[in-house]
A protein has these predicted regions:
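Acidic, surface-exposed loops and disordered segments
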Residues: 1-133
Length: 133
């Protein structure tokens, strides 16, 4: 747990990048996989990552980001795309927990019922939750 505290307390915001640095696809994939381990409401992972790392894509993103140099200079920029309606994926996402015996049918049904009660018909709330996650 000390490593977690050290990482959180030692983090900094980076604004200057070496524009000649290139990340491998394996490094980009590992970063994305680590991001996917972060907690979300009902573990729905109601967002997707888009890795922007080609010169052409970085140039388009930089133009859309008010020409911030860091967007063009970074080896990769991850765009986080929120997913409205992510709670509808919950039965598929948590079925392995049911099948593995980690939760029983009542807990499975309860989670789905709670998620549907929280999110159904509440587009603004779903959008806000995707941004928060």
């Amino acid at each position: 747990m000390t490593d977690v505290f050290s990482a959180i307390n030692g983090r900094t915001s980076a604004n200057n990048f070496d524009p000649t640095h290139v990340m491998t696809q394996a490094e980009i994939t590992e970063l994305a996989q680590l991001a996917n381990q972060t907690p979300t409401s009902f573990n729905q992972q109601n967002w997707r990552l888009v890795a922007v790392n080609t010169p052409a894509a970085k140039a388009r993103l930089k133009a859309a980001a008010y020409n911030q140099p860091k967007v063009g200079d970074a080896a990769v920029t991850f765009v986080v795309v929120g997913k409205v309606g992510g709670h509808k994926d919950l039965p598929v996402l948590i079925k392995p927990m049911l099948d593995g015996g980690y939760i029983d049918q009542a807990a499975f049904d309860g989670w789905i019922g709670m998620a549907n009660g929280m999110y159904d018909g509440k587009d603004q709330f779903q959008r806000d939750e995707a941004i928060r996650s």
